[in-house]
A protein has these predicted regions:
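A broad, structure-centric signal for solvent-exposed, well-ordered loop/edge residues
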Residues: 16, 28, 54-57, 152
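Mixed-charge (acidic/basic) macromolecular-recognition segments
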Residues: 33-131
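Short linear, low-complexity motifs centered on an aromatic residue
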Residues: 30-48, 153-165, 169
């Protein structure tokens, strides 16, 4: 999924030019060959996000990409198979304050978070009722279920998050 992914490495050295890169290999190659106007190698860069998918953009925001984290970012970006994994990862890091390191994988937190897509708590309650989360309810009793009250109860266990333009509700285990 990284075919549109583009970054710019802006040197902190004002006598040097930056460079665009789309992969770790390209970054390493350009990093090693880039010199300032005095012929000295450039050591520090600000990494600027230029282009990518919605999931790659969110991943960039989550990882607070700095020069030393470029290999980790590309490792995680290569693991993107769907938006759900990135949403789960975003919630784990941003809302649940999970720590990430060089060994972290994109799906490490999937088993710890239950995510549901809905616009409001009432929509979530109605979704749960329709999916049978309350068990089999006889037809003659279905009109007595108060979706608003159930939605209010769900607020105790589920939290709302806006990730990648999606409103999701999650519960962590």
């Amino acid at each position: 999924m990284t075919n549109t992914l583009t970054f710019f490495a802006q040197p902190y050295d004002i006598s040097a030019c930056g460079f665009y890169f789309t992969s770790l290999d390209e970054y390493n190659s350009k990093y090693k060959s880039n010199v300032n106007s005095y012929g000295q190698p450039i050591e520090e860069y600000e990494i600027q996000y230029i282009n990518g998918s919605k999931a790659e953009t969110e991943l960039f925001a989550i990882t607070s990409l700095e020069q030393m984290h470029i290999p980790q970012y590309f490792k995680l970006a290569d693991q993107i198979t769907n938006d759900h994994d990135v949403i789960s990862f975003s919630i784990a890091v941003n809302d649940l304050h999970k720590k990430i390191d060089a060994d972290t994988n994109l799906d490490d937190f999937n088993d710890e978070i239950s995510i549901h897509y809905a616009d409001t708590y009432k929509d979530l309650a109605e979704q749960f009722i329709d999916e049978g989360m309350l068990g089999d309810i006889p037809q003659h009793l279905q009109n007595y279920i108060d979706a608003d009250a159930y939605a209010n109860d769900l607020k105790c266990d589920y939290f709302k998050a806006d990730v990648m333009g999606e409103t999701v509700f999650y519960m962590s285990f």
